[in-house]
Amino acid sequence: MILKKIAAISAAAVLLLSSSAYGSSLYTVYDLSEEIKLSKSIAYERIEKYTSVGWMNINVIRADLTDEYTEIKPINSDEGVSNRAVLSSMIKSSGAVAAVNGDFFYMGDPTYTYGPLIRDKKLITSPLPFNDGYPTVSSLSDGSVNISVWNPKITVYGSDSTEFNVVVLNKTSSIEWGPTILTSDWNKTSPGYTAKDIVEVVIVDNIVSEVRKNQPSTIIPENGYVIASSNASTMEQMLNSFKEGQPVSLNIELDFSPEDVNWSFGALNYIVKDGRENEISSQVLGAHPRTAIGFNKDNTEMIMVTIDGRHRDYVGAKQTELAQIMIDLGAYNAVNMDGGGSTTMGVDFLRNANVTVVNIPSDGRERKIASGVGVFNNYPDSDIVDKIEIEASQNTVFNKTETQLKLKFFNEYYIPLDIDSKNVNYRVSPADAGKVINNVFIPEKPGKATITAYAGNAEGQIEINVLDKPVALELDTDSLTLGFNDKYDLGDILGIDKDGNSATIPWKYINCSYRNRVGKVEDGVFTSNDIANTGAITLTFEDAIKHIQVKVGYRYKTLNRFENLDGLKLTLYPEESSGEISITNDFAKEGESSLKLNYDFTKMTDQSIAFIEFGNDGEGIKLEDKPLAIGMWVYGDSKNHWLRTRITDAYGTQVKIDFEEEVNWTGWKWVEAKIPEGITYPITLKNIYLAEINETRKDTGTIYIDNLRIMYEPKDKQLGLVDETQFIDEMKTSAIANHTEKLTVSQGNYNHEGNGDIICFEGIISNGTMSSANVTMWNNIKSFMSYEDKVLVLSMNGDINNINDEREIRILKEILEKASQKNTVFVVFNGGKENTVIENKVRYITYDDSFEIGIIDRKISYKN
């Protein structure tokens, strides 16, 4: 095989023929990001980008190309480039630590990539013809990266010196138009005869081993190749020109000699060139899932990126937006790869072949693809701990509580190690700040505590902020209304100190007492008793007290004892069904009679239903006050039919509620249908009905109903509880007087008097969102981070908890918390009830009529 080098041709020259520039106007509100190091030279980043067009989910792999142990290689199916496979299996079989999908490929079988693949200085497959204009990305031996359109020339000479122009190597795209060359990198065996005529010439060590026509597939020799064609004239030439035992020569001329190329792979568009957005091809316009690969200016870092799209939470990206994102990530040159359903990034976080697909494939699963681009760690094995990282379940805790410590161990190459943390020693500074027992830090005095974990010569540190005792306790709920033996997770309990700092207190440190035997709390889960009652849970820690009022069970009101049929009527579906209701003394749970329902579901079409309607004309019974449930006794027949009720709300909207999905018992059983939360009262009980939709249950039967009751929450009681402890903000005052600067906010308007140490901007929530399209608003809010020694006020038109997307809340809080490092920050809104919550130095304040804040002698006071 003869390889020659010919001049490379710039991709831009070709792309200009069919493209036009599209500038990106993408506005980024904020990036939520996290990073995980995969090795000393490889890192994974996840970025959720809030933009003017919506949310983007961006996954990034960064690889240091100067590291001698880091390698880039194209990857493909271990069964050859003619076979598709999901990216995760390619990562497993190749040993890569991370990878993204490759370029365009033929979706049929056998598949082929549009671009070339060079791996370990070996040509695996050549690109499609030059006219297609797809660029090739190559790492050259001198450390440079070349992005250009290749124009290879492949020629094979028959035994009689006949010249055959071969369009591609290891692709069957041209097999019907001329000859193609297939090596063992294509597949283990040749295509062979199927429905179309085919001639295959087997070459071993440049000698014709066999000339085959319409034969089954044969093994492709490791030290040779197969020349194949289904084109009539080419097949005739091949039969005439290739003779068994005669020599053959193959000449492949590439833009670069493979010996000068570390690796090559194909791409779709050259989207960033020399640090600027390049001319963008008009192919695949619109916002879609995207994959891109870029390099920094000196080609020392490779940046692989996926952007999710076609998803309810993520909008995808246009090519122009992709180009801008690549520039923002540090790319000086970049290409985009195949996208859409092919966009995939996989990471082997623990280097154990357990690959995680970190993006969200738009098809809902990985697509089988033809190739990928992998990053490899070739570090020497080492089990010596070089670095220790410590994570705490809480970095801020109250004194005399605890925080869990989690340790991660790495060798000198930042490869994770599986080390038993029992072999680690700890040191706490100051020495009297606390102690570590079984990887749990127990603080013994307020202040800063530095914990050092060490093993051998390796160590890691973490600082824990220890708060003094809390003055108040907070929970997400102040009251509970539960049925009998119900369980309710109370969630985290938050302590607040005198300065407004807060931390979660583990439930094991909370003392729980009870008023009126309503139930019991274990590990933060309350279980109600089986007796109706009204009482309270009292939670205490140190001097802080919090009450939760609890109502258990129900107050019952009997609606019908079923002693007669007044106001009751039976209707059936389908109408030709049969059935009857009657009052009977045969079975009675309470009293002397019950309602007997005989039903016949044998004439079912799509379903069978027996309705017991309430009211003389089926108008129903309007229920008093606000019932929580409807209950009754039912004597079942174990026929497994569906027992339900229909109610209507104040607007006449019908709601169906289950008593039981299946009547699967014989004898009396109490059943309940709970009224849905949020329903608009008053409600009307329309009917009770037995239904069946399963045609295998066409049968007859009888059930009995007794003592229909409406269930209300228990009445309030005077509990005589001690007062809860409260947090009182030292900045809060009853009046703002003698100020040098003052801001008043009322009903969304504000009046500012003074010299400009108070900065106020407006935050607008509309339809559950702080719209990313409101660029002025977000720029104002982000400008808070640039101020120093100011009082910053964000006047909201509603509670930030009314924002539907938790990520928006997180963005807002991150911006405000960064601003609070050098400023005093307030978030205020008119909520009708005065309240102050301090979270990470940011004050969230609810005011009832107006909010006033003033400064005098650098002292800040506010009134809400």
Predicted regions and their residues:
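Low-complexity "stalk/linker" and mucin-like segments enriched in Ser/Thr/Pro/Ala/Gly
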Residues: 427-440, 513-525
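Extracellular carbohydrate recognition and processing domains
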Residues: 652-685, 700
